[in-house]
Amino acid sequence: MKKILVVGDLIADYYLWGKSERLSPEAPVPVLEVQKENKNLGGAANVANNLISLKAKVFLCGVVGDDLEGKHFLNALKARNIDTSGILTDKTRCTTLKTRIIAQNQQIVRVDKEIKDPLNADLRKRLLDFFTEKIQEIDGVILSDYNKGVLDFELTQTMIALANQHHKLILCDPKGKDYSKYSHASLITPNRAELEHALHLKLDSHANLSKALQILKETYQIAMPLVTLSEQGIAFLEKGELVNCPTIAKEVYDVTGAGDTVIASLTLSLLELMSLKDACEFANAAAAVVVGKMGSALASLEEIALILNQTHPKILPLEKLLETLDQQKIVFTNGCFDLLHKGHASYLQKAKALGDILIVGLNSDNSVKRLKGDKRPIVSEKDRAFLLASLSCVDYVVVFEEDTPIKLIQALKPDILVKGADYLNKEVIGSEFAKETCLMEFEEGYSTSAIIEKIKRTHND
Protein backbone atom coordinates (compact mmCIF):
# COMPACT_ATOMS: atom_id res chain seq x y z
CA MET A 1 0.00 0.00 0.00
CA LYS A 2 1.50 3.32 -1.10
CA LYS A 3 1.80 6.09 1.50
CA ILE A 4 0.97 9.55 0.19
CA LEU A 5 1.14 12.93 1.90
CA VAL A 6 -1.44 15.45 0.68
CA VAL A 7 -0.92 19.12 1.59
CA GLY A 8 -3.28 21.93 0.70
CA ASP A 9 -6.52 23.82 1.17
CA LEU A 10 -9.27 21.92 2.97
CA ILE A 11 -12.81 22.61 1.77
CA ALA A 12 -16.18 21.38 3.04
CA ASP A 13 -18.58 20.85 0.13
CA TYR A 14 -22.23 21.19 1.19
CA TYR A 15 -24.99 20.16 -1.22
CA LEU A 16 -28.67 21.07 -1.00
CA TRP A 17 -30.77 19.03 -3.45
CA GLY A 18 -34.38 19.64 -4.26
CA LYS A 19 -36.92 20.96 -6.72
CA SER A 20 -37.75 24.50 -7.73
CA GLU A 21 -41.13 25.17 -9.28
CA ARG A 22 -41.96 28.73 -8.19
CA LEU A 23 -40.49 32.16 -7.60
CA SER A 24 -40.25 33.83 -4.23
CA PRO A 25 -42.85 36.56 -3.50
CA GLU A 26 -40.03 38.53 -1.81
CA ALA A 27 -37.80 38.82 -4.89
CA PRO A 28 -37.62 37.42 -8.44
CA VAL A 29 -35.58 34.38 -7.37
CA PRO A 30 -36.42 30.65 -7.41
CA VAL A 31 -37.51 28.88 -4.22
CA LEU A 32 -35.84 25.54 -3.55
CA GLU A 33 -37.82 22.86 -1.75
CA VAL A 34 -35.02 20.84 -0.13
CA GLN A 35 -35.38 17.08 -0.53
CA LYS A 36 -31.94 15.97 0.65
CA GLU A 37 -28.62 17.40 1.76
CA ASN A 38 -25.11 16.06 2.16
CA LYS A 39 -21.61 17.22 3.02
CA ASN A 40 -18.56 16.02 1.11
CA LEU A 41 -14.83 16.35 1.57
CA GLY A 42 -13.51 18.95 -0.86
CA GLY A 43 -10.25 20.53 -1.98
CA ALA A 44 -7.17 18.69 -0.74
CA ALA A 45 -9.47 16.48 1.35
CA ASN A 46 -11.18 15.29 -1.84
CA VAL A 47 -7.77 14.36 -3.25
CA ALA A 48 -7.13 12.37 -0.06
CA ASN A 49 -10.56 10.75 -0.31
CA ASN A 50 -9.85 9.71 -3.90
CA LEU A 51 -6.58 8.14 -2.81
CA ILE A 52 -8.36 6.17 -0.08
CA SER A 53 -10.82 4.91 -2.70
CA LEU A 54 -7.80 3.74 -4.71
CA LYS A 55 -6.43 1.79 -1.71
CA ALA A 56 -3.64 4.16 -0.61
CA LYS A 57 -2.58 5.17 2.90
CA VAL A 58 -3.07 8.94 3.20
CA PHE A 59 -1.67 11.62 5.50
CA LEU A 60 -3.49 14.95 5.13
CA CYS A 61 -1.91 18.28 6.04
CA GLY A 62 -3.83 21.57 6.13
CA VAL A 63 -5.90 23.96 8.23
CA VAL A 64 -9.50 24.12 9.47
CA GLY A 65 -11.25 26.81 11.49
CA ASP A 66 -12.07 26.63 15.18
CA ASP A 67 -15.75 26.04 14.46
CA LEU A 68 -18.43 23.37 14.32
CA GLU A 69 -17.82 22.90 10.59
CA GLY A 70 -14.16 22.12 11.30
CA LYS A 71 -15.07 19.50 13.91
CA HIS A 72 -17.52 17.81 11.52
CA PHE A 73 -14.85 17.92 8.82
CA LEU A 74 -12.25 16.18 10.99
CA ASN A 75 -14.76 13.49 11.98
CA ALA A 76 -15.57 12.86 8.31
CA LEU A 77 -11.86 12.46 7.52
CA LYS A 78 -11.35 9.99 10.36
CA ALA A 79 -14.38 8.00 9.20
CA ARG A 80 -12.57 7.54 5.87
CA ASN A 81 -9.35 6.39 7.63
CA ILE A 82 -7.47 9.51 6.53
CA ASP A 83 -4.66 10.41 8.94
CA THR A 84 -5.48 13.87 10.38
CA SER A 85 -2.39 14.37 12.55
CA GLY A 86 -1.15 17.04 10.13
CA ILE A 87 -4.33 19.14 10.27
CA LEU A 88 -4.08 22.30 12.36
CA THR A 89 -6.78 24.58 13.78
CA ASP A 90 -6.60 28.29 12.96
CA LYS A 91 -8.60 30.36 15.44
CA THR A 92 -8.52 33.37 13.09
CA ARG A 93 -10.39 31.80 10.18
CA CYS A 94 -13.50 29.80 9.41
CA THR A 95 -13.45 26.37 7.82
CA THR A 96 -13.83 26.93 4.07
CA LEU A 97 -17.39 25.98 3.09
CA LYS A 98 -18.84 25.86 -0.41
CA THR A 99 -22.62 25.40 -0.53
CA ARG A 100 -24.13 24.29 -3.83
CA ILE A 101 -27.88 24.65 -4.42
CA ILE A 102 -29.14 22.08 -6.92
CA ALA A 103 -32.63 21.93 -8.41
CA GLN A 104 -33.73 19.21 -10.83
CA ASN A 105 -30.08 18.04 -10.90
CA GLN A 106 -28.91 21.47 -12.13
CA GLN A 107 -26.70 23.70 -9.98
CA ILE A 108 -28.38 27.09 -9.71
CA VAL A 109 -26.07 28.91 -7.29
CA ARG A 110 -22.96 28.38 -5.14
CA VAL A 111 -22.33 30.21 -1.86
CA ASP A 112 -18.74 30.42 -0.54
CA LYS A 113 -17.74 31.07 3.06
CA GLU A 114 -13.97 31.43 3.36
CA ILE A 115 -10.94 33.43 4.45
CA LYS A 116 -8.06 33.40 1.96
CA ASP A 117 -5.44 35.23 4.01
CA PRO A 118 -1.97 33.62 4.23
CA LEU A 119 -1.26 31.52 7.30
CA ASN A 120 0.54 33.12 10.22
CA ALA A 121 4.20 32.26 10.86
CA ASP A 122 3.45 29.78 13.65
CA LEU A 123 1.01 27.72 11.56
CA ARG A 124 3.37 27.73 8.56
CA LYS A 125 6.21 26.45 10.75
CA ARG A 126 4.05 23.69 12.23
CA LEU A 127 2.89 22.56 8.79
CA LEU A 128 6.48 22.48 7.54
CA ASP A 129 7.62 20.60 10.65
CA PHE A 130 4.97 17.95 9.98
CA PHE A 131 6.00 17.73 6.32
CA THR A 132 9.68 17.37 7.26
CA GLU A 133 8.83 14.65 9.78
CA LYS A 134 6.74 12.62 7.31
CA ILE A 135 8.76 13.01 4.11
CA GLN A 136 11.06 10.06 4.82
CA GLU A 137 8.29 7.52 5.43
CA ILE A 138 5.96 8.35 2.55
CA ASP A 139 6.22 7.38 -1.14
CA GLY A 140 4.88 10.53 -2.76
CA VAL A 141 3.48 14.03 -2.18
CA ILE A 142 0.55 15.95 -3.64
CA LEU A 143 0.27 19.72 -3.20
CA SER A 144 -3.40 20.62 -3.76
CA ASP A 145 -3.50 24.39 -4.17
CA TYR A 146 -6.92 26.06 -4.19
CA ASN A 147 -5.46 29.50 -3.44
CA LYS A 148 -7.06 29.66 0.03
CA GLY A 149 -3.90 30.67 1.89
CA VAL A 150 -2.18 27.42 2.88
CA LEU A 151 0.33 26.99 0.05
CA ASP A 152 2.12 30.32 -0.31
CA PHE A 153 5.15 30.66 -2.60
CA GLU A 154 7.83 30.09 0.02
CA LEU A 155 6.15 27.09 1.68
CA THR A 156 5.42 25.46 -1.68
CA GLN A 157 9.01 25.83 -2.88
CA THR A 158 10.41 24.57 0.44
CA MET A 159 8.22 21.46 0.28
CA ILE A 160 9.17 20.76 -3.34
CA ALA A 161 12.87 21.11 -2.45
CA LEU A 162 12.50 18.72 0.50
CA ALA A 163 10.66 16.17 -1.63
CA ASN A 164 13.37 16.31 -4.29
CA GLN A 165 16.09 16.08 -1.65
CA HIS A 166 14.52 12.81 -0.44
CA HIS A 167 13.88 11.57 -4.02
CA LYS A 168 10.10 11.59 -3.58
CA LEU A 169 7.59 12.07 -6.38
CA ILE A 170 5.79 15.40 -5.89
CA LEU A 171 2.77 16.47 -7.94
CA CYS A 172 1.08 19.88 -7.81
CA ASP A 173 -2.43 20.96 -8.76
CA PRO A 174 -1.70 24.65 -9.49
CA LYS A 175 -3.64 27.87 -9.06
CA GLY A 176 -2.81 31.44 -10.05
CA LYS A 177 -0.56 32.70 -12.82
CA ASP A 178 2.92 32.47 -11.29
CA TYR A 179 4.07 28.92 -12.03
CA SER A 180 7.56 29.58 -10.67
CA LYS A 181 5.82 28.70 -7.40
CA TYR A 182 5.78 25.05 -8.60
CA SER A 183 9.19 24.96 -10.30
CA HIS A 184 11.14 21.70 -9.96
CA ALA A 185 8.00 19.66 -9.16
CA SER A 186 7.78 16.18 -10.69
CA LEU A 187 4.50 17.00 -12.41
CA ILE A 188 1.79 19.67 -12.38
CA THR A 189 -1.80 19.25 -13.59
CA PRO A 190 -3.17 22.57 -14.91
CA ASN A 191 -6.29 22.55 -17.05
CA ARG A 192 -6.42 24.41 -20.36
CA ALA A 193 -7.82 27.66 -18.91
CA GLU A 194 -5.33 27.69 -16.01
CA LEU A 195 -2.34 27.15 -18.29
CA GLU A 196 -3.52 29.78 -20.78
CA HIS A 197 -3.90 32.26 -17.91
CA ALA A 198 -0.45 31.47 -16.50
CA LEU A 199 1.45 31.62 -19.80
CA HIS A 200 -0.67 34.22 -21.65
CA LEU A 201 -0.83 31.76 -24.54
CA LYS A 202 -3.95 30.52 -26.32
CA LEU A 203 -3.86 26.71 -26.45
CA ASP A 204 -5.82 26.45 -29.68
CA SER A 205 -3.36 24.39 -31.72
CA HIS A 206 -0.92 21.49 -31.43
CA ALA A 207 1.94 23.93 -31.90
CA ASN A 208 0.84 26.12 -28.99
CA LEU A 209 0.14 23.12 -26.76
CA SER A 210 3.62 21.82 -27.44
CA LYS A 211 5.11 25.28 -26.84
CA ALA A 212 3.29 25.62 -23.50
CA LEU A 213 4.50 22.23 -22.28
CA GLN A 214 8.06 23.03 -23.37
CA ILE A 215 7.87 26.23 -21.30
CA LEU A 216 6.79 24.21 -18.25
CA LYS A 217 9.70 21.84 -18.78
CA GLU A 218 12.45 24.30 -19.64
CA THR A 219 11.48 27.48 -17.78
CA TYR A 220 9.93 25.93 -14.69
CA GLN A 221 11.89 22.65 -14.67
CA ILE A 222 8.76 20.48 -14.41
CA ALA A 223 9.96 16.92 -15.01
CA MET A 224 6.69 15.68 -16.56
CA PRO A 225 4.66 18.62 -17.90
CA LEU A 226 1.06 17.95 -18.90
CA VAL A 227 -2.25 19.75 -19.35
CA THR A 228 -5.78 18.41 -18.89
CA LEU A 229 -8.10 19.25 -21.77
CA SER A 230 -11.57 18.25 -20.50
CA GLU A 231 -13.31 16.16 -23.17
CA GLN A 232 -10.09 16.12 -25.26
CA GLY A 233 -8.17 14.17 -22.63
CA ILE A 234 -4.63 14.88 -21.41
CA ALA A 235 -1.69 16.21 -23.43
CA PHE A 236 1.94 15.69 -22.42
CA LEU A 237 5.44 15.58 -23.86
CA GLU A 238 7.28 12.36 -24.63
CA LYS A 239 10.86 12.75 -25.87
CA GLY A 240 10.00 16.31 -26.87
CA GLU A 241 6.97 15.30 -28.93
CA LEU A 242 3.36 16.20 -28.08
CA VAL A 243 1.24 13.19 -27.13
CA ASN A 244 -2.51 13.32 -26.58
CA CYS A 245 -4.17 10.70 -24.41
CA PRO A 246 -7.84 10.91 -25.42
CA THR A 247 -10.61 10.89 -22.87
CA ILE A 248 -12.97 7.95 -22.56
CA ALA A 249 -16.40 8.81 -23.93
CA LYS A 250 -19.01 8.85 -21.17
CA GLU A 251 -22.06 10.92 -20.32
CA VAL A 252 -21.08 13.88 -18.14
CA TYR A 253 -23.29 14.77 -15.17
CA ASP A 254 -20.93 16.81 -12.99
CA VAL A 255 -17.26 17.77 -13.36
CA THR A 256 -16.93 18.78 -9.67
CA GLY A 257 -13.77 17.24 -8.24
CA ALA A 258 -12.61 15.67 -11.51
CA GLY A 259 -9.25 17.45 -11.23
CA ASP A 260 -8.75 15.96 -7.77
CA THR A 261 -9.44 12.51 -9.18
CA VAL A 262 -6.93 13.04 -11.98
CA ILE A 263 -4.04 14.07 -9.72
CA ALA A 264 -4.79 11.28 -7.23
CA SER A 265 -4.88 8.59 -9.91
CA LEU A 266 -1.80 9.97 -11.70
CA THR A 267 0.16 9.89 -8.45
CA LEU A 268 -0.69 6.29 -7.65
CA SER A 269 -0.08 5.16 -11.24
CA LEU A 270 3.37 6.75 -11.37
CA LEU A 271 4.26 5.33 -7.95
CA GLU A 272 3.37 1.90 -9.36
CA LEU A 273 5.99 2.61 -12.05
CA MET A 274 3.54 3.01 -14.91
CA SER A 275 4.71 5.01 -17.91
CA LEU A 276 3.30 8.54 -18.14
CA LYS A 277 1.09 7.42 -21.05
CA ASP A 278 -0.36 4.51 -19.06
CA ALA A 279 -0.79 6.76 -16.02
CA CYS A 280 -2.75 9.26 -18.14
CA GLU A 281 -4.97 6.47 -19.49
CA PHE A 282 -5.65 5.34 -15.92
CA ALA A 283 -6.41 8.94 -14.85
CA ASN A 284 -8.75 9.43 -17.82
CA ALA A 285 -10.64 6.28 -16.85
CA ALA A 286 -10.93 7.44 -13.23
CA ALA A 287 -12.20 10.84 -14.40
CA ALA A 288 -14.73 9.14 -16.68
CA VAL A 289 -16.16 7.37 -13.63
CA VAL A 290 -16.52 10.48 -11.45
CA VAL A 291 -17.99 12.82 -14.08
CA GLY A 292 -20.75 10.26 -14.57
CA LYS A 293 -21.90 10.90 -10.98
CA MET A 294 -23.24 14.01 -9.23
CA GLY A 295 -21.15 15.84 -6.64
CA SER A 296 -17.51 15.28 -5.64
CA ALA A 297 -17.67 11.59 -6.49
CA LEU A 298 -15.08 8.83 -6.12
CA ALA A 299 -13.82 6.12 -8.46
CA SER A 300 -13.03 2.63 -7.19
CA LEU A 301 -10.38 0.39 -8.73
CA GLU A 302 -13.16 -1.93 -9.89
CA GLU A 303 -15.00 0.90 -11.67
CA ILE A 304 -11.80 2.05 -13.33
CA ALA A 305 -11.02 -1.51 -14.44
CA LEU A 306 -14.47 -1.73 -16.00
CA ILE A 307 -13.86 1.47 -17.99
CA LEU A 308 -10.38 0.36 -19.10
CA ASN A 309 -11.56 -3.10 -20.06
CA GLN A 310 -14.87 -2.08 -21.59
CA THR A 311 -13.63 -3.36 -24.96
CA HIS A 312 -14.79 -6.85 -23.93
CA PRO A 313 -18.18 -7.54 -22.30
CA LYS A 314 -16.87 -10.63 -20.47
CA ILE A 315 -14.51 -8.55 -18.30
CA LEU A 316 -16.49 -7.36 -15.28
CA PRO A 317 -15.87 -6.04 -11.76
CA LEU A 318 -17.11 -8.31 -8.99
CA GLU A 319 -20.20 -6.22 -8.18
CA LYS A 320 -21.40 -6.29 -11.79
CA LEU A 321 -20.61 -9.99 -12.10
CA LEU A 322 -22.72 -10.83 -9.04
CA GLU A 323 -25.66 -8.99 -10.61
CA THR A 324 -25.22 -10.97 -13.83
CA LEU A 325 -25.15 -14.51 -12.43
CA ASP A 326 -28.30 -16.57 -12.15
CA GLN A 327 -28.77 -20.21 -11.10
CA GLN A 328 -26.04 -21.70 -13.27
CA LYS A 329 -23.46 -24.18 -11.99
CA ILE A 330 -20.42 -21.98 -11.42
CA VAL A 331 -16.83 -23.12 -11.91
CA PHE A 332 -14.10 -20.80 -10.64
CA THR A 333 -10.36 -20.82 -11.18
CA ASN A 334 -7.68 -18.18 -10.95
CA GLY A 335 -4.15 -17.34 -11.91
CA CYS A 336 -1.75 -14.86 -13.48
CA PHE A 337 -2.06 -16.29 -17.02
CA ASP A 338 1.02 -14.40 -18.16
CA LEU A 339 1.98 -15.34 -21.75
CA LEU A 340 -1.19 -17.33 -22.43
CA HIS A 341 -0.29 -20.70 -24.00
CA LYS A 342 -1.82 -24.03 -25.05
CA GLY A 343 -1.47 -25.46 -21.54
CA HIS A 344 -3.61 -22.63 -20.16
CA ALA A 345 -6.25 -23.09 -22.87
CA SER A 346 -6.45 -26.86 -22.31
CA TYR A 347 -6.74 -26.37 -18.53
CA LEU A 348 -9.54 -23.82 -18.94
CA GLN A 349 -11.45 -26.00 -21.43
CA LYS A 350 -11.41 -28.91 -18.97
CA ALA A 351 -12.51 -26.59 -16.15
CA LYS A 352 -15.45 -25.28 -18.21
CA ALA A 353 -16.62 -28.85 -18.87
CA LEU A 354 -17.31 -29.26 -15.14
CA GLY A 355 -20.18 -26.74 -15.06
CA ASP A 356 -22.26 -24.12 -16.86
CA ILE A 357 -20.26 -20.94 -16.23
CA LEU A 358 -16.47 -20.61 -16.01
CA ILE A 359 -15.25 -17.54 -14.12
CA VAL A 360 -11.53 -16.76 -14.18
CA GLY A 361 -10.05 -14.63 -11.41
CA LEU A 362 -7.04 -12.78 -12.83
CA ASN A 363 -4.21 -11.35 -10.72
CA SER A 364 -3.72 -7.63 -11.44
CA ASP A 365 -0.33 -6.33 -12.56
CA ASN A 366 0.45 -5.21 -9.01
CA SER A 367 -0.56 -8.59 -7.60
CA VAL A 368 1.63 -10.45 -10.12
CA LYS A 369 4.56 -8.16 -9.35
CA ARG A 370 4.28 -8.92 -5.64
CA LEU A 371 4.03 -12.68 -6.25
CA LYS A 372 6.58 -13.14 -9.03
CA GLY A 373 8.94 -10.16 -8.83
CA ASP A 374 9.43 -6.77 -10.45
CA LYS A 375 10.04 -8.17 -13.95
CA ARG A 376 6.59 -9.72 -14.16
CA PRO A 377 4.05 -9.69 -15.63
CA ILE A 378 5.30 -9.78 -19.20
CA VAL A 379 1.80 -9.01 -20.50
CA SER A 380 -0.35 -6.26 -18.93
CA GLU A 381 -3.53 -7.12 -17.02
CA LYS A 382 -5.59 -5.34 -19.66
CA ASP A 383 -4.18 -7.57 -22.41
CA ARG A 384 -4.22 -10.73 -20.27
CA ALA A 385 -7.88 -10.12 -19.41
CA PHE A 386 -8.77 -9.52 -23.06
CA LEU A 387 -7.01 -12.71 -24.21
CA LEU A 388 -8.77 -14.81 -21.57
CA ALA A 389 -12.14 -13.25 -22.39
CA SER A 390 -11.56 -14.10 -26.06
CA LEU A 391 -11.53 -17.84 -25.27
CA SER A 392 -14.91 -19.46 -25.92
CA CYS A 393 -14.60 -21.63 -22.80
CA VAL A 394 -14.29 -18.56 -20.52
CA ASP A 395 -17.56 -16.86 -19.60
CA TYR A 396 -16.30 -14.08 -17.33
CA VAL A 397 -12.99 -12.57 -16.22
CA VAL A 398 -12.67 -10.58 -13.00
CA VAL A 399 -9.40 -8.85 -12.04
CA PHE A 400 -8.37 -8.80 -8.37
CA GLU A 401 -5.74 -6.63 -6.65
CA GLU A 402 -5.04 -8.85 -3.64
CA ASP A 403 -2.41 -11.61 -3.47
CA THR A 404 -5.14 -14.28 -3.31
CA PRO A 405 -8.69 -14.53 -4.71
CA ILE A 406 -10.24 -15.27 -1.31
CA LYS A 407 -12.63 -12.28 -1.51
CA LEU A 408 -13.82 -13.33 -4.96
CA ILE A 409 -14.39 -16.93 -3.90
CA GLN A 410 -16.20 -15.87 -0.73
CA ALA A 411 -18.53 -13.61 -2.73
CA LEU A 412 -19.12 -16.00 -5.65
CA LYS A 413 -19.44 -19.23 -3.61
CA PRO A 414 -18.72 -21.38 -6.69
CA ASP A 415 -20.06 -24.88 -7.10
CA ILE A 416 -16.60 -26.07 -8.14
CA LEU A 417 -13.24 -24.50 -7.33
CA VAL A 418 -10.55 -25.66 -9.77
CA LYS A 419 -6.82 -25.58 -9.07
CA GLY A 420 -3.79 -27.29 -10.60
CA ALA A 421 -2.76 -30.77 -9.48
CA ASP A 422 0.36 -29.21 -7.95
CA TYR A 423 -1.92 -28.26 -5.04
CA LEU A 424 -2.17 -31.92 -3.99
CA ASN A 425 -1.60 -32.12 -0.21
CA LYS A 426 -1.62 -28.30 -0.02
CA GLU A 427 -4.26 -25.93 1.30
CA VAL A 428 -6.45 -24.57 -1.49
CA ILE A 429 -7.35 -20.99 -0.58
CA GLY A 430 -11.11 -20.45 -0.53
CA SER A 431 -12.05 -24.13 -0.62
CA GLU A 432 -14.32 -23.64 2.41
CA PHE A 433 -16.57 -21.38 0.31
CA ALA A 434 -16.94 -23.84 -2.59
CA LYS A 435 -19.19 -26.88 -2.69
CA GLU A 436 -16.42 -28.92 -4.29
CA THR A 437 -12.70 -28.52 -5.00
CA CYS A 438 -11.19 -30.16 -8.07
CA LEU A 439 -7.44 -30.53 -8.71
CA MET A 440 -6.69 -30.72 -12.42
CA GLU A 441 -3.55 -31.84 -14.26
CA PHE A 442 -1.80 -29.31 -16.50
CA GLU A 443 -0.84 -30.35 -20.02
CA GLU A 444 2.75 -31.52 -19.83
CA GLY A 445 5.47 -29.45 -21.46
CA TYR A 446 3.82 -26.05 -21.22
CA SER A 447 4.60 -23.25 -18.75
CA THR A 448 5.11 -19.50 -18.82
CA SER A 449 8.47 -19.85 -17.06
CA ALA A 450 9.67 -22.29 -19.73
CA ILE A 451 8.63 -19.88 -22.49
CA ILE A 452 10.50 -17.01 -20.81
CA GLU A 453 13.64 -19.15 -20.45
CA LYS A 454 13.44 -20.22 -24.10
CA ILE A 455 13.17 -16.57 -25.18
CA LYS A 456 16.21 -15.72 -23.05
CA ARG A 457 18.26 -18.57 -24.56
CA THR A 458 17.25 -17.61 -28.09
CA HIS A 459 18.12 -13.97 -27.44
CA ASN A 460 21.51 -14.90 -25.98
CA ASP A 461 22.29 -17.11 -28.95
Curated annotation (Swiss-Prot):
Keyword ATP-binding: yes
GO cellular component annotations of the record: cytosol
Region named Ribokinase: 1-311
Keywords noted in UniProt: ATP-binding, Carbohydrate metabolism, Kinase, Multifunctional enzyme, Nucleotide-binding, Nucleotidyltransferase, Transferase
Reaction(s) catalysed by this chain's protein: D-glycero-beta-D-manno-heptose 7-phosphate + ATP = D-glycero-beta-D-manno-heptose 1,7-bisphosphate + ADP + H(+); D-glycero-beta-D-manno-heptose 1-phosphate + ATP + H(+) = ADP-D-glycero-beta-D-manno-heptose + diphosphate
Residues annotated as binding ATP: N191, R192, A193, E194
Pathway(s) this gene product operates in, as recorded in its UniProt entry: Nucleotide-sugar biosynthesis; ADP-L-glycero-beta-D-manno-heptose biosynthesis; ADP-L-glycero-beta-D-manno-heptose from D-glycero-beta-D-manno-heptose 7-phosphate: step 1/4; Nucleotide-sugar biosynthesis; ADP-L-glycero-beta-D-manno-heptose biosynthesis; ADP-L-glycero-beta-D-manno-heptose from D-glycero-beta-D-manno-heptose 7-phosphate: step 3/4
EC number from the UniProt entry: 2.7.1.167, 2.7.7.70
Kinase as UniProt keyword: yes
CDD domains: RfaE_like (cd01172)
One Gene Ontology term from the biological process aspect of the record: ADP-L-glycero-beta-D-manno-heptose biosynthetic process
Top-level taxonomic group: Bacteria
Pfam families noted in UniProt: CTP_transf_like, PfkB
Region (Cytidylyltransferase): 332-461
SUPFAM superfamilies listed in its UniProt record: Nucleotidylyl transferase, Ribokinase-like
Active site: residue positions: D260
Gene Ontology molecular function, alphabetical: ATP binding; heptose 7-phosphate kinase activity; heptose-1-phosphate adenylyltransferase activity; phosphotransferase activity, alcohol group as acceptor
Alphabetized PANTHER family for the sequence: BIFUNCTIONAL PROTEIN HLDE
Subunit structure: Homodimer.
Family: In the N-terminal section; belongs to the carbohydrate kinase PfkB family.
Primary role: Catalyzes the ADP transfer from ATP to D-glycero-beta-D-manno-heptose 1-phosphate, yielding ADP-D-glycero-beta-D-manno-heptose.
Protein name per Swiss-Prot or TrEMBL: Bifunctional protein HldE
Gene: hldE
